[in-house]
């Protein structure tokens, strides 16, 4: 893992990194914001800074949210690091959408492990996000016994659009092992098996077999996962989102949790006048940051 660039932001530093991934068999870029606490000389040696992983949406790179969502102010306020991974493998050798569209292929990896060629060789994004990347960051930053950042245990996950889907899916798939302390999402795709974006991705990456789709669909996963304690999923979506009715359909998640142990623990806030942009995301980042900070034990 090598440092590409560093920027002073708020009270901390945004670091742009690249590394060779065993999961995707490509070079991957990732941004991380280290809050002011990381650089404080009086930071307790026995304390570790928790991490929030933010998964971006279709077409995005690690730069979009790190430049436009304004997470850094909240990271400094509460004391967590935030990781901005890429949305897919990239490169001339990486298969892309044969139609040249922006909703599949490079920039649209859907955070799953592809089983269909020519995508299976590189599009192993589930393993990359939830297994390899946290371990790689831990090895890079926590050297020589100087362990200040927690990428493995006290961790939360969130995301926007395709990334909101990826956050909920990863949270649910790792729920029994308590992989993430909390999950939230901005305008997520909640039922990919039943909307055009998701169907295109699932057919291309997973094939026609619906049993494979079920392993990555939050509305199907959540029915078979028993809720514990007071764990909640927080979701915001704008009522002026142009993708709301065709691709997002948040009401399908509420229908899926009816009469399950999750029924009272999925909160979807539909906010008036907001669209799908980072104007929407940045407006509600403070509420999501507080939600995660509470679950990470920071407040």
From Swiss-Prot:
Q: What is its main location?
A: cytoplasm
**Keyword set includes Metal-binding:** yes
Which cellular compartments is it found in?
Cytoplasm
Pfam families, per the entry? Esterase
Query: Per its record, how is this protein called by name?
Result: S-formylglutathione hydrolase
GO BP annotation list: formaldehyde catabolic process
The entry's family comment says: Belongs to the esterase D family.
The organism's taxonomic lineage, starting at the top? Eukaryota, Fungi, Dikarya, Ascomycota, Saccharomycotina
pH dependence, entry free text: Optimum pH is 7.
Q: Which organism is it from?
A: Saccharomyces cerevisiae (strain ATCC 204508 / S288c)
Which GO molecular function entries does the Swiss-Prot or TrEMBL record give? carboxylic ester hydrolase activity; metal ion binding; S-formylglutathione hydrolase activity
Q: What does this protein do?
A: Serine hydrolase involved in the detoxification of formaldehyde.
